[in-house]
């Protein structure tokens, strides 16, 4: 199995995740492993798997995507997998969970307002901790621009 022996169960605004730190790129999960771990009856159970790693260790990223992480000062990458094992571009609740996880692992600042730049398949996201609400964390996640469409009758 290409998953470390120790993982963390994380929750964020109604979603639950399995998270782990992979600082040297040794633990890239297979789709089957993700499905097994996320299975609510036979595994740990989760909406998805969050692997915190360096952008250069994510096999499906192009050189341009890795360069975009470098340009955006994102030392860390959220390699998010859906519970069915498929790759996901982004998950807002996942960014919340992985940021607190990164703080608890000592790879992100816990200073209130200090930006944590996180690479995702949807680009670099800048998250800012708003201070702890023990035992939970609080943070600000930019949500991008909303799209609205209207039809005329």
Regions found by a protein language model. Give the residues of each.
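A glycine-rich beta-to-alpha transition motif near the start of alpha/beta enzyme domains, typified by
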Residues: 1-133, 140
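Low-complexity basic/metal-binding stretches
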Residues: 136-146, 151-152
């Amino acid at each position: 199995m290409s998953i470390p022996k120790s993982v963390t169960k994380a929750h964020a605004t109604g979603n639950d995740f399995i998270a782990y730190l992979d600082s040297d790129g040794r633990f890239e999960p297979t789709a089957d492993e993700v499905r097994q771990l996320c299975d609510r009856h036979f595994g740990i159970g989760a909406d998805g798997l969050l692997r915190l790693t360096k952008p250069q260790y994510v096999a499906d990223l192009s050189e341009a995507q890795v360069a975009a992480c470098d340009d955006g000062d994102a030392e860390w990458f959220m390699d998010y997998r859906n519970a069915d094992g498929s790759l996901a571009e982004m998950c807002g609740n996942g960014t919340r969970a992985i940021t607190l996880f990164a703080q608890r692992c000592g790879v992100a600042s816990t200073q209130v307002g200090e930006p944590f730049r996180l690479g995702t398949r949807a680009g670099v996201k800048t998250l800012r901790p708003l201070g702890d609400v023990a035992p939970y964390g609080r943070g600000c996640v930019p949500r991008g621009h909303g799209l609205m469409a209207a039809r005329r009758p």
